[in-house]
């Protein structure tokens, strides 16, 4: 759900942090529905609790290198307001805080991970107490995680996946069609 919502949001002049935070809220809603978090998705994101499950940014620019130089602009221009907002919401792991412009090539890759060492660290430090249900989370310690990446180019009116609409199957219906169920 987060992946497709993010893909629909990528458009010229859209603040990247808004897209990143939308992905976090959608993922938090899913974790709440599984009983792994309590409260509201907004509270989980504001507390930084989603960094336990998505300890990376939503994506990155692509250009001369696979991971293009996001931080160059942040060193050259004053993004202090955005950086302050990111630090407060626990999204300081998001490297790209720019506004999206036509011609930008970037990735859309929200993910969810269950990293035992990170879970243990946050639990021991009492982080996200009242938000994360660490006892329920124990059942997912061996799950690992998942992240699906699409590469996107921003157009004058929106965006499109590089390679067109052809992608690997990712939904339950798509996967069942491939395996013949």
Predicted features along the sequence, with ranges:
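Active-site neighborhoods and metal-handling regions in enzymes and metal-associated proteins
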Residues: 1-181
């Amino acid at each position: 759900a987060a992946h497709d919502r993010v893909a629909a949001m990528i458009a010229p002049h859209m603040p990247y942090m808004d897209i990143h935070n939308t992905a976090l809220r959608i993922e938090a809603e899913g974790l709440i529905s599984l009983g792994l978090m309590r409260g509201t998705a907004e509270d989980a994101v504001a507390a930084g609790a989603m960094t336990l499950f998505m300890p990376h940014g939503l994506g990155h620019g692509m250009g001369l290198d696979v991971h293009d130089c996001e931080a160059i602009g942040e060193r050259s221009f004053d993004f202090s307001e955005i950086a302050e907002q990111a630090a407060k919401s626990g999204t300081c792991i998001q490297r790209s805080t720019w506004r999206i412009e036509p011609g930008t090539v970037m990735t859309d890759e929200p993910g969810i991970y269950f990293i035992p060492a990170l879970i243990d660290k946050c639990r021991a430090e009492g982080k996200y107490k009242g938000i994360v249900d660490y006892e329920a989370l124990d059942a997912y310690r061996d799950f690992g995680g998942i992240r699906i990446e699409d590469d996107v180019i921003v157009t004058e009116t929106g965006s499109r996946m590089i390679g067109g609409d052809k992608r690997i199957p990712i939904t339950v219906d798509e996967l069942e069609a491939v395996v013949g169920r």
